């Protein structure tokens, strides 16, 4: 108590001294600050500031959402030095997920709303000072900002479902702390997001001179994604899935993917090229978060991709921390029989290819572009062949590494200490993703042959993606196109489209959201936990933490609102059900 009194008295004495002398400093203008009125008077710069938030993230709040979309699923393990490395472990087991654990959820919430605040300020700036721009440019910039705001809100809705809708009017009226998160149903919130994307679609050009800006085609693709999300239900398994299809929304998916299919975007010729930095902003890339190397933009470290800063392979990169690890179940999913997936029996036996030792078991070529495996070149470079030493904790997270989010090792990092960071763009929407959305909708409205045609186009590209980058695995690859008989019923077609989506988009942070949309998350994940905890690689077991894993429907479909957000304004927000 004496110590506390001394601290208080000392603080009061210091305050007296400060107040006695503060008159000398009150008239001094602060340095290195931004005059808000001046900033708001420059609408074009305010729009640029909103764009800047796209890549303004960190591993504790990665806007590409790899912890939320992948390590929560059957595609990936968390990785790292063990289950306590970062606070993401509850995501991979679900059973220990609470409103305060992991605390990274609060960072994600906060930074997504910071991004939305940027957008709202830009919209106010355009409304009040837009006459500094010509009429056409002003409308385009407004379309871009509303696209960005919808993009950030879509992420919030994906994670939490019930979130407060704070737009420029709420910002103007300073009513943020009076805006409830349960004011809108799932559908009402999604339709507000749709309204923003629709404004962008109606007012943006089909192409922009500056790479990285949103355009009409990106808005069409996002509209398709929104309508596809709504078409299956509200996300909770009791009211989601094949028995809850909204045909009108599925037709909207067809309508907007028609626009994408008729645009100048398309499939890159080789699957591997999609994930090489020299092909960023290619015809495959409809919208991507832009990143750069310091050698390109003349800055100290470049505009690095900090979302993936932990996801480099252990021992391969100077600071690769070995997070975001492909699962054995995912590797098994690439098995083929007669060139087609082994739907019923793919996971009966734990298997993996070994370089130079082909067996009767063949694999979809996309495996070798997606998963780094011991004995194989790391991202196509023989001088950087992976070994078992390239896994940080194989007794916990196995021996595989993710390849898509990293460049080739010879290209180096743009930042290398104490973490590595790369100049890889982050795809938000790529052409193949959108075409698979189209195939999904075609199945549900009864155009099974149209869906088969899309899937076979994608598989043909995969078949053609061996010689250029993975010739060393040619004797282990086998892939075939689907005959019409494989798409004979809606159930058969649905299975094949969903499987194709898993193979094509593996490790691209969408898997859990796909499972939830289809209404099959609990059955898929609880079966995965039961099998995966017994996985053995080269005689060694791992993934024992899945003994404690369980996905609870009517609860885990969405994440809990962060406790800190509930605490800030008690009674304003309603927690998601089950938490």
Language-model features and meaning:
Residues 1-11:
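Bacterial N-terminal signal peptides that target proteins for export
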Residues 3, 17-42, 193, 224, ...:
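Bacterial Sec-dependent N-terminal signal peptides
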Residues 10-18:
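Bacterial N-terminal signal peptides
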Residues 22-72, 558, 562-579:
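Membrane-proximal, proline-rich intrinsically disordered regions
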Residues 25, 43, 99, 112-115, ...:
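Long, intrinsically disordered, low-complexity segments
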Residues 40, 44-48, 52-57, 82-160, ...:
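Conserved, well-structured interaction surfaces
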Residues 167-279:
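Hydrophobic, small-residue-rich alpha-helical packing segments that form membrane-like cores
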């Amino acid at each position: 108590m004496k110590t506390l009194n001394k601290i208080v008295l000392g603080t009061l004495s210091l305050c007296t001294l400060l107040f006695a002398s503060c008159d000398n400093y009150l008239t001094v203008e602060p340095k290195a600050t931004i005059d808000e009125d001046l900033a708001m008077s420059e609408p074009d710069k305010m729009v640029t500031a909103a764009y800047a938030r796209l890549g303004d993230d960190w591993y504790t709040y990665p806007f590409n959402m790899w912890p939320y979309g992948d390590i929560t699923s059957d595609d990936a393990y968390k990785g790292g030095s063990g289950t306590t490395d970062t606070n993401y472990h509850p995501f991979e087991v679900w059973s220990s997920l609470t409103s305060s654990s992991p605390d990274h959820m609060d960072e994600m919430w906060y930074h997504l709303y910071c991004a939305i605040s940027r957008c709202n300020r830009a919209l106010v700036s355009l409304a009040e000072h837009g006459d500094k721009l010509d009429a056409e440019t002003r409308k385009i910039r407004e379309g871009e900002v509303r696209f960005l705001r919808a993009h950030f809100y879509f992420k919030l809705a994906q994670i939490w479902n019930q979130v407060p809708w704070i737009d420029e009017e709420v910002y103007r009226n300073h009513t943020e702390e009076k805006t409830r998160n349960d004011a809108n149903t799932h559908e009402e919130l999604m339709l507000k997001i749709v309204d923003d994307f629709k404004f962008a679609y109606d007012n943006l050009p089909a192409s922009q001179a500056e790479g990285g800006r949103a355009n009409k085609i990106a808005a069409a693709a996002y509209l398709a994604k929104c309508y596809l999300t709504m078409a299956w239900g509200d996300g909770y398994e009791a009211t989601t899935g094949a028995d809850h299809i909204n045909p009108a929304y599925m037709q909207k998916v067809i309508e907007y993917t028609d626009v994408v299919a008729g645009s100048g975007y398309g499939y890159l010729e080789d699957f591997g090229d999609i994930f090489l930095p020299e092909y960023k902003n290619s015809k495959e890339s409809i919208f991507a978060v832009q990143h750069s190397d310091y050698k390109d933009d003349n800055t100290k470290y470049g505009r690095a991709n900090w979302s993936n800063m932990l996801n480099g392979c252990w021992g391969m990169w100077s600071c690769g921390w070995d997070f975001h690890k492909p699962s054995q179940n995912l590797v098994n999913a690439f098995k083929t029989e007669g060139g087609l997936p082994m739907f019923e029996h793919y996971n009966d036996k734990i298997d993996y290819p070994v370089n130079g030792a082909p067996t009767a078991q063949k694999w979809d070529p996309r495996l070798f572009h997606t998963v780094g495996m011991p004995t194989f070149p790391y991202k196509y470079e023989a001088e950087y062949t992976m070994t078992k030493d390239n896994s940080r904790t194989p007794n916990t997270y196995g021996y595989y590494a993710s390849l898509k989010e990293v460049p080739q090792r010879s290209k180096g990092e743009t930042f290398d200490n104490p973490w590595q960071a790369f100049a890889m763009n982050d795809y938000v929407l790529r052409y193949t993703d959108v075409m698979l959305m189209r195939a999904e909708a075609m199945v549900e409205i009864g155009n099974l042959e149209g869906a088969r045609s899309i899937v076979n186009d994608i598989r043909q590209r995969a078949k053609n993606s061996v010689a250029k980058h993975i010739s060393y695995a040619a004797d282990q690859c086998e892939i075939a196109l689907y005959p019409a008989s494989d798409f004979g019923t809606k159930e058969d077609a649905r299975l094949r489209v969903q499987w194709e989506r898993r193979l094509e988009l593996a490790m691209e942070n969408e898997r859990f959201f796909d499972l939830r949309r289809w209404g099959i998350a609990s059955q898929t994940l609880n079966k995965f936990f039961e099998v995966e905890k017994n996985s053995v690689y080269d005689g060694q077991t791992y993934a024992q933490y899945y003994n404690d894993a369980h996905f609870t429907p009517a609860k885990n479909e969405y994440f809990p609102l962060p406790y800190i957000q509930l605490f800030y304004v008690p009674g304003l927000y309603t927690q998601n059900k089950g938490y």
